[in-house]
Amino acid sequence: MKCPFCGGVENKVMDSRVSRDGNAIRRRRECLACGRRFTTYEYIEEMLPTVVKKDGRREPFDRNKIRMGIRKACEKRPISTETIESLVTEVERFCQDYSGEEIRSSMIGEKIMKLLKELDGVAYVRFASVYRQFRDVNDFLEELKEFKQLHDLKKEKEP
């Protein structure tokens, strides 16, 4: 495993444990060249679908692309790395239902928005603003209005 800090390839595993959802092994590693520590996750390789983009291009499913989008939306929010990894795993599992087939990128985007909406309103709106390509403030306000209505309905149903 290559060190993300110095590029060294010699490291030792300091700690290994199964993730909360049981689908990955989390390892803390220490680089033998620079002494810094970093975390890696080990997953079972599964057949994942080809993603069909809006413009018709096809590309392989990329877990890291999902992670980066969710991480960017959750930036400076009280959301742990483990929670983000759990969301990424949930999206990946959703896509595994289309294993060997194709899945539209819009289905993946909608799944991420649904998960973020349940987790954190600010992260949801951030993701939606990029995913839905808001053109101006009115688009943004319309999305906020819909989110607030759903949020208010949930509050009314709580005992």
From Swiss-Prot:
Signal peptide: none
GO MF: ATP binding; DNA binding; zinc ion binding
GO BP: negative regulation of DNA-templated transcription
Domain ATP-cone: 49-139
Recorded coiled-coil stretches: none
Keyword terms of this UniProt record: ATP-binding, DNA-binding, Metal-binding, Nucleotide-binding, Repressor, Transcription, Transcription regulation, Zinc, Zinc-finger
Record Pfam families: ATP-cone, Zn_ribbon_NrdR
PROSITE patterns to which the protein is assigned, alphabetical: ATP_CONE (PS51161)
Cofactor: record remark: Binds 1 zinc ion.
HAMAP family the record matches: NrdR (MF_00440)
Chain's role: Negatively regulates transcription of bacterial ribonucleotide reductase nrd genes and operons by binding to NrdR-boxes.
PANTHER family: TRANSCRIPTIONAL REPRESSOR NRDR (PTHR30455:SF2)
Stated name of the protein: Transcriptional repressor NrdR
Source species of the chain: Syntrophus aciditrophicus (strain SB)
